[in-house]
């Protein structure tokens, strides 16, 4: 289908008031970007970028819904509550019924108008949600009529959706929106990400999955996928999620494909176990975000591997006899790439899941509101996530535990090619290390594929005294837990500087 994006108007011009009122009609979107630093204050520059509100150089945008309904990536805003969006936020607010917003602060914004709901890029996503809800209802009905002693938990589980597309195609936004809509409908879907570039409910450089059964944080720069949605030593604005996390320690999959494959397999096994143990989660299904992929770059094997790992030997690659996996990707959503859709359709057209289902390919147009994220944006996002993990944000201040430990009391492993014990040195300063749920006496392959317990930051290395200053989110000795020093995220930052 075509999404023309008709009626998009020029960015709003500045006003003399610090607060503006924006009126949205049904299916209109208010799109905004809070810059990383100050906004130009000359009249010409302001006119060029459309400064929302006054007070250039402010640290964020504030929004209040005064009438109607509005949501951010599927999570509703409460009426007459003030929301603050921090620096480096790129997002939108959508209304299905019409809404009035009061906005203030320093940001770039515009209103996307559509002559009819059919022209909105959100309508296909909403229709997809309703179709998934029908599949969830069918799974619930099938499960209730099946013998509960079956180890597979009944018939086919709810929909298992893999979302893919090229770089900056809106994959994560669609995954987040579908998760929020499913949660609002009373479901508890499993949501996963096998893209190490950003991290979901964890620091960048990881793959993870978690049950989403509660509301997401509207004010989170990642709209509910950030580290603010996980347990911490301080209060949380929303109920926290409990992710299963595996540490890749690389930015891109192609930097270490064998390692990524192994960890995706571990994540698939964790998802399988959760489906087997929790009927409610099983009925809600899976929503899986994937790394950017294109036919031209030869990324198809990455997506094929994801389907294979979450499909119980669907493609018959390297599975032992008796391999059973209840989590089977049966829906592949492709955003904005006709070539990618056609190639995946060709690869999967004759395949069936372990439940006898055909794999459905769905092509959705890329939203005209998707923002392109440059290297500076991604670097700021990574550093902000690390800082928030240890120190919290504007709503929640955390005080990391600082301890001085001897070189002899820690076990650090590094990953140049294979995992090996590393000598502690000044080079380690300001890096973030993953603490693994394993023992230092375990074989290297066990340590490398173990789940992540948490992260620590090396604030300082004193080679003369052979001491490390370590920041951790909670108090407690590191004990015999091995730590992995990866290649990424970098460049590293001085959290205490």
From Swiss-Prot:
Which residues does the annotation say bind ATP? 29, 168-173
* Annotated Pfam families: Clp1, CLP1_N, CLP1_P
Functional description taken from the UniProt entry: Required for endonucleolytic cleavage during polyadenylation-dependent pre-mRNA 3'-end formation.
Q: Which organism is it from?
A: Chaetomium globosum (strain ATCC 6205 / CBS 148.51 / DSM 1962 / NBRC 6347 / NRRL 1970) (Soil fungus)
Signal peptide residues are none
Q: Report what the protein is called.
A: mRNA cleavage and polyadenylation factor CLP1
Protein localization: Nucleus
Give the UniProt record's GO annotations in the biological process aspect: mRNA 3'-end processing; tRNA splicing, via endonucleolytic cleavage and ligation
Segments of this protein annotated with the region Disordered: 1-20
Keywords from the UniProt entry? ATP-binding, mRNA processing, Nucleotide-binding, Nucleus
The UniProt entry's GO CC annotations, sorted and at most eight, read: mRNA cleavage factor complex
Q: Which Gene3D superfamilies does the record match to this protein?
A: Clp1, DNA binding domain (2.60.120.1030), P-loop containing nucleotide triphosphate hydrolases (3.40.50.300), Pre-mRNA cleavage complex subunit Clp1, C-terminal domain (2.40.30.330)
Give the domain of life.
Eukaryota
Question: What is the taxonomic lineage of the source species?
Answer: Eukaryota, Fungi, Dikarya, Ascomycota, Pezizomycotina
Q: How does it assemble?
A: Component of a pre-mRNA cleavage factor complex. Interacts directly with PCF11.
Question: Which InterPro entries does the entry link to?
Answer: Clp1, Clp1/Grc3, Clp1_C, Clp1_C_sf, Clp1_N, Clp1_N_sf, CLP1_P, P-loop_NTPase
Indicate the family of this protein.
Belongs to the Clp1 family. Clp1 subfamily.
Main subcellular location: nucleus
Offer an example of a GO molecular function term for this protein. Answer: ATP binding
């Amino acid at each position: 289908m075509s999404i023309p994006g008709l009626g998009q108007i020029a960015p709003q011009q500045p006003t003399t008031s610090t607060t503006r009122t924006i009126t949205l009609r049904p299916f209109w979107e208010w799109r905004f970007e809070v810059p990383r630093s100050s906004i130009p204050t000359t009249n010409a520059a302001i006119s060029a970028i459309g400064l929302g509100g006054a007070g250039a150089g402010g640290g964020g945008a504030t929004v209040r819904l005064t009438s109607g309904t509005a949501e951010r990536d599927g999570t509703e805003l409460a009426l007459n509550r003030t929301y603050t969006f921090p620096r480096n936020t790129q997002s939108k607010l959508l209304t299905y019924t019409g809404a009035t917003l009061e906005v203030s602060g320093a940001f770039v914004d515009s209103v996307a108008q559509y002559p009819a709901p059919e022209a909105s890029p959100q309508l296909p996503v909403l229709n997809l949600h309703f179709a998934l809800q029908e599949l969830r209802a069918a799974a619930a009905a099938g499960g209730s009529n099946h013998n509960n002693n079956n180890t597979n938990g009944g018939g086919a589980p709810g929909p298992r959706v893999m979302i893919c597309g090229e770089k900056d195609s809106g994959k994560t936004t669609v995954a987040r929106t579908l998760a929020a809509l499913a949660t609002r409908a009373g479901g508890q879907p499993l949501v996963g990400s096998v893209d190490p570039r950003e991290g979901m409910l964890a620091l960048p450089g990881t793959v993870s999955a978690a049950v989403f059964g509660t509301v997401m944080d509207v004010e989170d720069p990642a709209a509910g996928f950030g580290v603010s949605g996980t347990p911490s030593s301080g209060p949380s604005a929303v109920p926290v999620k409990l992710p299963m996390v595996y540490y890749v320690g690389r930015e891109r999959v192609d930097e270490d494909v064998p390692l990524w494959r192994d960890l995706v397999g571990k994540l698939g096994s964790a998802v399988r176990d959760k489906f087997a143990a929790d009927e409610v989660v099983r009925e809600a299904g899976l929503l899986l975000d994937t790394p950017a992929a294109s036919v031209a770059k030869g990324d198809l094997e990455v997506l094929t591997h994801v389907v294979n790992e979450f499909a119980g030997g669907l493609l018959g690659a390297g599975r032992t006899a008796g391999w059973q996996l209840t989590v089977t990707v049966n829906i592949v959503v492709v955003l904005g790439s006709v070539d990618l859709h056609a190639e995946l359709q060709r690869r999967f057209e004759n395949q069936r899941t372990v439940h006898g289902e055909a794999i459905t390919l769905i092509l959705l147009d890329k939203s005209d509101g998707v923002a392109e994220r440059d290297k500076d944006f991604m670097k700021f996002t990574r550093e902000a996530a690390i800082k928030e993990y240890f120190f919290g944000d504007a709503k929640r201040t955390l005080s990391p535990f600082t301890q001085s430990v001897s070189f002899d009391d820690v076990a650090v492993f590094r990953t140049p090619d294979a995992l090996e014990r590393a000598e502690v040195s000044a080079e380690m300063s300001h890096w973030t290390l993953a603490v693994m749920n394993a023992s230092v006496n375990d074989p290297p392959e066990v340590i490398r594929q173990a789940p992540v317990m948490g992260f620590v930051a090396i604030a300082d290395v004193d080679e003369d005294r052979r001491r490390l200053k370590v920041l951790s989110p909670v108090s407690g000795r590191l004990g015999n837990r091995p730590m992995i020093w990866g290649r990424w995220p970098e460049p590293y930052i001085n959290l205490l500087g």
